[in-house]
UniProtKB/Swiss-Prot annotation:
Protein name: Fibulin-2
Domain of life from the UniProt record: Eukaryota
Region called Domain III, residue ranges: 1111-1221
Pfam families, A to Z: ANATO, cEGF, EGF_CA, FIBL-2, Fibulin_C, FXa_inhibition
Region feature (Disordered): 248-329, 341-399, 633-661
Tissue specificity annotation: Component of both basement membranes and other connective tissues.
Source organism per UniProt: Mus musculus (Mouse)
Family: Belongs to the fibulin family.
Positions annotated as glycosylated: 179, 497, 737, 1072
Gene this protein is translated from: Fbln2
Disulfide bonds: 435-462, 436-469, 449-470, 479-508, 492-509, 511-535, 512-542, 525-543, 598-610, 606-619, 621-634, 673-683, 679-692, 694-707, 713-726, 720-735, 742-754, 805-818, 812-827, 833-845, 899-912, 906-921, 923-936, 942-954, 950-963, 965-978, 984-993, 989-1002, 1004-1017, 1023-1035, 1031-1044, 1046-1060, 1066-1079, 1073-1088, 1093-1105
A Gene Ontology term for the protein's cellular component: extracellular region
UniProt GO BP: positive regulation of cell-substrate adhesion
Main location: secreted
Length: 1221
């Protein structure tokens, strides 16, 4: 019974292996093993549908690579991916980068600014962006009208601007019977303006005669548009010389004046061909505003009087278009109004102004000039003018219309003033140009743009142009100053007076410093568009060594007139001898192309003043004189007030003291300044003596009458800096920046030529006292002092013969001639003179001038020409004007081709074009005249149109420009755009290359990494980076990858290529165990075990033996009822303590108790038994096994159940190996 119960007890064994847990297996939706998914090209968003093995593309597009990523983020694509068909802008909106349809690579295209629509009247310009149209409307006669508005151009005329802009729609108001003529039409006879015509002429406000218009009897006062009341003739005063002007002690600036004097309107008196009587002129007066005396809003207008022209039509024209006469902010000199009974003004091209100050009988100080002249504004009486050829023409007693002026300015009576043309009938371009020049001049004079005076008559265009050009000039000026400061090593600090933030001094100084540093390091000068304008351009200019230049205003050629002006025969006759070609013959001439005849032939063309005009010149007279019929000479003005009478009634003042450069005439005469006396320029009466003086820039000559130019450059009275050289002109000078560097031993003269320095004269040599200095070109030489014999002199280190006959050191008597010899001379008797010669007192034969000694050597029509010993009679040649010469037959005058004969004065780099009687100098394409209009300078197109000519970098070249691209780009065929270079085609990368916009990126295949040079790929040692992670046994690195290896015996590589699988030699039959042995597989090997049952036991299974019989109870209790064999495999280094075997009865009953004992194999104490509870025990490892080792343990378990004891034996074979998969 006990045996049966014991036989029914089963042992439950458990192996504790915490190191190898069993993972839970997840069941997929679908088995996708071996499925191949297609490559999704240009896909930026994927999606995997339920049940599918491959993802599908939801959105195609372009991936932003490199620096493009930041542009994409700025453009709104935060993930760095641009959907197909969408784009973004970079470089301040000048370049559009887009992703093509279907995705791929991003391409960028430079965009030029679109043209504004023609009906745009207001452009909105955003910083670093293209201009956009802010408002549409209509432009009529230079004025802008908003769309949808209706305006009244006259009392009987209204015009409407359509909603879409375009042309004004005008109509006559019903019930109105006024003149319907277009009062807004421009003056068809408006003269051409030359912005660079720096001529010797007086200011327009002082050089033009007051123009008078006939007023018919019965007229009811002046037109309403002109203002003012009625003024009796007795209230009209005459001021012979303008009150606000200084005494005329200065001549006109004959040289190139300042840019403010670059524009002067010329007023010419045009006559109809069929009218022989002279024009009548009108003076219109508008009262000055309170608080600003002397400032009016109009200039005199001209209206020729024709028969049958009614007064009502003239008044209607004046009422309909008062704007025609307005010139905003005209900086001119006010004219005075004539007194009753005063002599009429002359009919010359210049005002008959007297160099005397105005007097007023009602003033306490009759000689003190008024700082702010006042005008009478009562309406004039009606008067009729009847010109007569025998008597001077009477001028109606009308008040003049005085233009605006600035009384505090010091105005030269003969200087060229800038009169901006505010004629609203002109084109918008002309208005912008003239107002822009006024804004630049305000910046030059005041160095600020906040206090520009505003005039109600000015249009918005003029105000905007003035302010923008003023600010632009100050910015360019401060930028140039910053560049110069950087080059001179100054600290780049902000300007203290920059309260408006328009100064670019610090920015340009800093940016120039960057360019200078790059240049000092010897690096190449490359543009960096990211610096922006103007920093990038200034940096590049300083790096390349270019000088900054404020580019003069670029002017377009004038459009030809609709029809040539008709000139009367009388006027043509007075001009024929002076003109070098009419303006009608120069339709293609540019401003500044005119040859200044007054400067070419000073003092030869006119008696007093020479005024240059486009293609010709004209003569004018000093105050108190009028031009005669020949157009050259001047005669005293019979109608002008006498100077002596005006001065006799006025006490002396300090201003009438004699200037230091005046010389009194030796013989004083009463009334000596009548008709300007003997003086060439200015005559003054001091006591009873006529004193002649000169204008500034001139000095009185020894004769006390004439004036000669003072060379300020030689006298050292100029104010040119050390960076400039002085160029003298008639009466003035100007400074020019140095652009020519002379070699050592040479110096730059006033003509900008390098001339030799005479070191011997300037004491710059190093010769000793015993040596003689001899100057050589660019240097000098020192020679030892020599002693020459009599008759010789030391010259250039050598003794040369002295010509006593030439030096006059001979002693030959009368009748003898001196003959020079080497070192001496001799006297030779003279011979008798032949016919035609006469012996002088010294015995020489001199020629007899028969042309002067004979009474009539030649008959009429021939000229006497003296010859040596005789004379000849020659027919008088044909007298031709300048620019013409007689032909070979002497029958007619033909044009001189100055361009072919080389007598022109065109500068280097200019083109000469022959004209009838003259020639013209033009600049080559890409060049323009400088601010003085004398030389051609290169146009820096890159500064004129920054950021619009080239996509990347604009480089200025002489006469043109060229575009260049940044690294990674090539210039396109159009020479402006830049195309990306595909660097991958040149195989710059060792493995994979990806081209990106403006650059490229090298990539490496899997298993390689990019080296520091960015081009080479090096192998990645995966085994060193992932030690112990990649492979379970050993990792072997190979090029581009790695391989896992297993021990040479006992293992094989698994399908994953990383893990090693133990070879079961027992299952494979590769063991060498005998038939009596049992093969047991262990990690990497096997063991041959022999399971034999002892006597009295029978084998019930391969590993179990049971006892058969038992002789007595004691034997049954001591001998095991069953012997079981167990094989256990463990890895060395197992953490201790570790339960390796659990034993107990199965099934267990209440009251069961067990005990465990290791009876064999634990001599070293590696193992220990322990009871977990009454019926369960474990075998534990208490010492760590560090080396491979085999143990054979006998573990005996005794079971107490219901008072009996049963023994069980467990034979355990424990194997510790070094590696386990």
């Amino acid at each position: 019974m006990l045996l049966q119960e014991s036989a029914g007890v089963w042992l439950a064994l458990a192996l504790v292996t915490a190191l190898t847990p069993s993972p839970s297996m997840a069941v997929p939706w679908q088995d996708c093993t071996g499925a191949e998914c297609p490559l999704l090209e240009n896909c930026i968003e994927e999606a995997l549908e339920p049940g599918a093995c491959c993802a599908t593309c939801v959105q195609q597009g372009c991936a932003c690579e490199g620096y493009q990523y930041y542009d994409c983020v700025q453009g709104g694509f935060v993930d760095g991916r641009v959907p197909a068909g969408q784009s973004y802008f970079v470089d301040f909106g000048s370049t559009e980068c887009s992703c093509p349809p279907g995705g791929g690579k991003i391409s960028c295209q430079f965009m030029l600014c679109p043209e504004l629509p023609p009906n745009c009247i207001e452009a909105v310009v955003v910083a670093d962006s293209c201009p956009q149209c802010g408002q549409v409307g209509c432009v009529h006669s230079g004025r802008k009208y908003a769309a949808g508005h209706t305006v009244h151009l006259s009392s009987c005329r209204a015009c409407h601007c359509p909603d879409a802009g375009g042309e004004l729609i005008c109509y006559q108001l019903p019930g109105c019977h006024g003149n319907f003529s277009d009062a807004e039409e421009g003056d068809s006879e408006r003269q051409y303006e030359d912005p660079y015509s720096y001529d010797q002429e007086v200011a327009e406000a002082e050089a033009t005669t007051a123009i008078v218009n006939e007023v018919q009897a019965g007229a009811e006062g002046p037109p309403a548009a002109l203002g003012g009341g009625n003024l009796p003739p007795s209230s009209i005063r005459v001021t012979p010389w303008p009150v606000a002007l200084p005494r005329p002690t200065a001549a006109a600036a004959l040289g190139p004046p300042a840019p403010v004097q670059a524009k002067a309107r010329r007023v010419t008196l045009d006559t109809e061909e069929d009218e022989e009587e002279e024009e009548e002129e009108t003076l219109v007066t508008e009262p000055p505003t309170a608080g600003s005396p002397g400032r009016l809003d109009s200039l005199p207008t001209r209206s020729p009087a024709r028969p049958g022209f009614p007064v009502q039509e003239k008044e209607a024209e004046a009422k309909a278009g008062p704007e025609e006469n307005l010139i905003p902010d005209a900086q001119v000199t006010p004219r005075s109004v004539m007194q009753e009974g005063a002599a009429p003004l002359p009919r010359s091209g210049l005002a008959a102004l007297s160099p005397s100050l105005a007097t007023d009988s009602s003033s306490e100080d009759p000689v003190k000039p008024s700082d702010h002249p006042t005008l009478s504004t009562l309406p004039p009486d009606r008067a009729q003018v009847s010109p007569s050829p025998e008597t001077p023409e009477e001028i109606p007693q009308h008040p003049q219309l005085l233009p605006r002026f600035r009384a505090e300015e010091d105005i030269d009576p003969n200087s060229v003033h800038s009169v901006p043309r505010g004629d609203l009938d002109g084109s918008t371009k002309d208005l912008i140009e003239t107002c822009c020049a006024a804004g630049q001049q305000w910046a030059i004079d005041n160095d600020e743009c906040q206090e520009i005076p505003e005039n109600g008559a000015q249009s918005d265009i003029c105000r905007i142009a003035q302010r923008q050009c003023c600010i632009s000039y100050l910015k360019e000026k401060s930028c140039v100053a910053g560049v110069m400061g950087a080059k001179e090593g100054e600290t780049c600090g902000a300007e203290d007076n920059d309260t408006c933030g328009v100064s670019l001094y610090k920015q340009c100084c800093d940016c120039c410093g960057l360019g200078l540093r790059v240049r000092a390091e010897g690096q190449s000068c490359e543009s960096n568009p990211n610096l922006g304008y103007p920093c990038n351009h200034v940096m590049l200019s300083c790096c390349e060594g270019e000088e900054p230049l404020i580019v003069p205003e670029v002017r377009r050629p004038p459009e030809p007139e609709a029809a040539p002006r008709r000139v009367s025969e009388m006027e043509m006759a007075s001009r024929e001898a002076l003109s070098l070609g009419t303006e009608a013959e120069l339709p293609n001439s540019l401003p500044g192309d005119d040859q200044d005849e007054c400067l070419m032939l000073p003092g030869e063309l006119c008696q007093h003043l020479c005024i240059n005009t486009v293609g010709s010149y004209r003569c004018a007279c000093f105050p108190g004189f009028e031009l005669q019929g020949d157009g050259r000479t001047c005669r005293p003005d019979r109608g002008a007030p006498q100077l002596d009478t005006a001065r006799e009634s006025a006490p002396r003042s300090e201003s009438a003291q004699v200037s230091p450069n005046t010389i009194p005439l030796p013989v004083p005469q009463p009334n000596t300044c009548k008709d300007n006396g003997p003086c060439r320029q200015v005559c003054r009466v001091v006591g009873d003596t006529a004193m002649c003086s000169c204008f500034p820039g001139y000095a009185i000559m020894a004769d006390g009458v004439s004036c000669e130019d003072q060379d300020e450059c030689l006298m050292g009275t100029h104010d040119c800096s050390w960076k400039q050289f002085c160029v003298n002109t008639l009466g003035s000078f100007y400074c020019v920046n140095h652009t020519v560097l002379c070699a050592e031993g040479y110096i730059l003269n006033a003509h900008r030529k390098c001339v030799d320095i005479n070191e011997c004269v300037t004491d710059l040599h190093t010769c000793t006292r015993a040596e003689h200095c001899v100057n050589t070109p660019g240097s000098f030489q020192c020679y030892k002092a020599l002693t020459c014999e009599p008759g010789y002199v030391l010259t250039d280190g050598e003794c040369t013969d002295v010509d006593e006959c030439v030096t006059g050191t001979h002693n030959c008597q009368a009748g003898f001639s001196c003959q020079n010899t080497k070192g001496s001379f001799y006297c030779q008797a003279r011979q008798r003179c032949m016919d035609g010669f006469l012996q002088d007192p010294e015995g020489n034969c001199v020629d007899i001038n028969e042309c002067t000694s004979l009474l009539e050597p030649c008959r009429s029509g021939f000229s006497c020409i003296n010859t040596v010993g005789s004379y000849t009679c020659q027919r008088n040649p044909l007298v031709c004007g300048r620019g013409y010469h007689a032909n070979e037959e002497g029958s007619e005058c033909v044009d001189v081709n100055e361009c072919e004969t080389g007598v022109h004065r065109c500068g280097e780099g200019q083109l000469c074009y022959n004209l009838p009687g003259s020639y013209r100098c033009d600049c080559k394409p890409g060049f323009q005249r400088d601010a003085f209009g004398r030389t051609c300078i290169d146009v820096n197109e890159c500064w004129v149109s920054p950021g619009r000519l080239c996509q990347h970098t604009c480089e200025n070249t002489p006469g043109s420009y060229r575009c260049s691209c940044a690294a990674g780009f090539l210039l396109a065929a159009d020479g402006k755009h830049c195309e990306d270079v595909n660097e991958c085609e040149t195989r710059r990368c060792s493995q994979e290359c990806a081209n990106i916009y403006g650059s490229y990126q090298c990539y490496c295949r899997q298993g390689y990494q990019l080296a520091e040079d960015g081009h080479t790929c090096t192998d990645i040692d995966e085994c060193a980076q992932g030690a112990g992670i990649l492979c379970t046994f050993r990792c072997v690195n190979v090029p581009g990858s790695y391989q896992c290896a297993c021990p040479e015996q006992g293992y094989t590589m698994m399908a994953n290529g990383r893990s090693c699988k133990d070879l079961d030699e027992c299952a494979l039959g590769t063991h060498n165990c005998s038939e009596a042995e049992t093969c047991h597989n262990i990690q990497g090997s096997f063991r041959c075990l022999r399971f034999d049952c002892p006597p009295n036991y029978v084998r019930v299974s391969e590993t179990k033996c049971e006892r058969t019989t038992c002789q007595d109870i004691t034997e049954c209790q001591t001998s095991p009822a069953r012997i079981t064999h167990y094989q256990l495999n463990f890895q060395t280094g197992l953490l201790v303590p570790a339960h390796i075997f659990r034993i107990g009865p199965a099934p267990a009953f209440a009251g069961d108790t067990i005990s465990l004992t290791i009876t064999k194999g634990n001599e070293e104490g590696y193992f220990v038994t322990r009871r977990l509870n009454a019926y369960t025990g474990v075998v534990s490892l208490q010492r760590s096994v560090l080396e491979p080792r085999d143990f054979a343990l006998d573990v005996e378990m005794k079971l107490w159940r219901q008072g009996s004891v049963t023994t069980f034996l467990a034979k355990m074979y424990i194997f510790f190996t070094t590696f386990a998969p």
